[in-house]
């Protein structure tokens, strides 16, 4: 009797133990994609991951980029941060500096990161994030409006822009919108052309830190700023009117409505513009503002995944990152974002309208947007100065660039 009872008890305990062992691990993941206006196919990818890894359950929490900076930072500091965090280069630097991110250097996917991006996922030669996308910043051009004015191709430099603007204005078409309320759009043009005059990564690094190069003394940056006045004088845009236009609202509406021929913006708008009936457009590289230079594909290293150094589920977290490193999975994300793959041999998801941009990128006419290399304070100074420049576009470019130098120190 005792032996039968002991055997039965052991059997029950074995079943309970097996159930405990079989219980799925819950992985807390936060990100600013996957909700709001950018679902980014994340729900489908989570479902696919859970199907392939039935022992892991993803608990995804959507929060904005701004909230991520404050809320997640506080949770990490308090020891109750998520297991996996969506990051960008700026957040990677911040959290790695506080020793809050796991070193991923030994992961199998590290050598597959595109060589032009790999260094930007590292600090001190160690890898701390898995990149998810490269997103282009380029020039949107309304092909019907260009054709109406007799402009055969999207301009690639200042001289072509001036000629195109003259034809467009003569045809009664607003040639260009350069929204300057936030300063972002004109700054993107200047940064792309300024950094393209040499090794872009090295130049970006050279302008920050003690004893570094000076924007105000750099010929390429001075010429790039001055070129904006040249374009204004050529009737490409009206500076004071553009100073009141937001790149994130009014500017998008104006281009989408077919009321402007050209506007610099990000590839993340391609899906929205493609869904607009009757809007025929191309997404091209940014035109060169520096004499002798070619057009520039301004690539921005977008979102990435990192792992909390204090996670209790490191193996499950690494499986989540390895899942995203697979080209078929990342492609589904890129399809929604109209992005480039950050992996060697990865498949890009750029639609036909973006082929001019893709060609420039593949030909090496690329500048990586220096977010994470330049501080948030420097970018704020850049954007504010560009907005102010549109109120007084006759000012000396060197004086404007001196404000950048002050913020870079």
Predicted features and spans:
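Conserved N-terminal structural module of periplasmic/extracytoplasmic solute-binding proteins
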Residues: 2, 10-13, 20-94, 109-110, ...
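Extracytoplasmic/periplasmic substrate-recognition and gating elements
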Residues: 47, 52, 147-149, 233, ...
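A structural signal for short loop-to-beta-strand junctions that line the ligand-binding cleft
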Residues: 83, 111-145, 174-178, 295-297, ...
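Hinge/lid segment of periplasmic solute-binding proteins
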Residues: 89-138, 162, 282-284, 354-355
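Short, solvent-exposed loop/beta-turn-alpha elements that line the ligand-binding surface or hinge
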Residues: 105-113, 197-223, 275-276, 288-296, ...
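Extracytoplasmic/periplasmic solute-binding protein
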Residues: 130, 137, 162-213
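Conserved C-terminal helix/tail region of periplasmic/extracytoplasmic solute-binding proteins
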Residues: 147, 362-409
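Glycine-centered hinge/linker elements that transmit conformational signals in sensory
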Residues: 166-167, 209-241
């Amino acid at each position: 009797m005792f032996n039968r009872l002991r055997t039965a008890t052991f059997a029950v305990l074995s079943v309970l133990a097996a159930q405990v062992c079989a219980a799925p691990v819950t992985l807390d993941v936060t990100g600013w994609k996957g909700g709001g206006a950018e679902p980014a196919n994340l729900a489908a990818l989570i479902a696919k991951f859970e199907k392939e890894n039935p022992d892991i359950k993803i608990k995804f929490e959507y929060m904005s980029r701004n909230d991520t900076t404050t809320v997640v930072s506080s949770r990490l500091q308090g020891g109750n941060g998520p297991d996996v965090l969506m990051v960008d280069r700026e957040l990677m630097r911040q959290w790695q500096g506080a020793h809050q991110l796991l070193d991923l250097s030994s992961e199998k996917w590290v050598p597959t990161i595109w060589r032009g991006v790999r260094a930007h996922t590292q600090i001190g030669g160690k890898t701390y994030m898995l990149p998810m996308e490269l997103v282009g910043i380029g020039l949107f051009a309304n092909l019907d409006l260009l054709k109406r004015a007799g402009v055969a191709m999207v301009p690639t430099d200042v001289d072509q822009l001036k000629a195109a603007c003259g034809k467009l204005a003569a045809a009664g078409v607003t040639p260009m919108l350069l929204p300057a309320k936030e300063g972002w759009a004109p700054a993107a043009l200047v940064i792309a052309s300024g950094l393209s005059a040499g090794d872009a990564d090295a130049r970006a690094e050279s302008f920050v830190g003690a004893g570094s190069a000076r924007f105000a003394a750099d010929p390429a940056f001075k010429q790039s700023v001055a070129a904006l006045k040249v374009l204004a004088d050529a009737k490409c845009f009206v500076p004071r009117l553009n100073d009141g236009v937001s790149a994130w609202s009014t500017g998008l509406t104006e281009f989408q409505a077919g009321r402007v021929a050209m506007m610099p913006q990000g590839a993340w708008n391609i899906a929205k513009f493609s869904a607009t009936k009757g809007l025929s457009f191309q997404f091209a590289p940014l035109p060169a503002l520096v004499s002798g230079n070619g057009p520039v594909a301004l690539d921005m290293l977008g979102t990435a995944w990192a792992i909390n150094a204090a996670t209790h589920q490191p193996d499950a977290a690494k499986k989540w990152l390895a899942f995203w490193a697979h080209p078929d999975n990342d492609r589904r994300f890129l399809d929604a974002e109209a992005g480039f793959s950050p992996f060697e041999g990865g498949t890009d998801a750029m639609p036909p309208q973006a082929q001019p941009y893709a060609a420039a990128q593949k030909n090496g006419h690329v500048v990586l947007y220096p977010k994470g290399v330049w501080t948030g304070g420097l970018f704020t100074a850049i954007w504010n100065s560009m907005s102010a420049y549109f109120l007084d576009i006759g000012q000396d470019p060197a004086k404007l660039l001196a404000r950048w130098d002050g913020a870079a120190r």
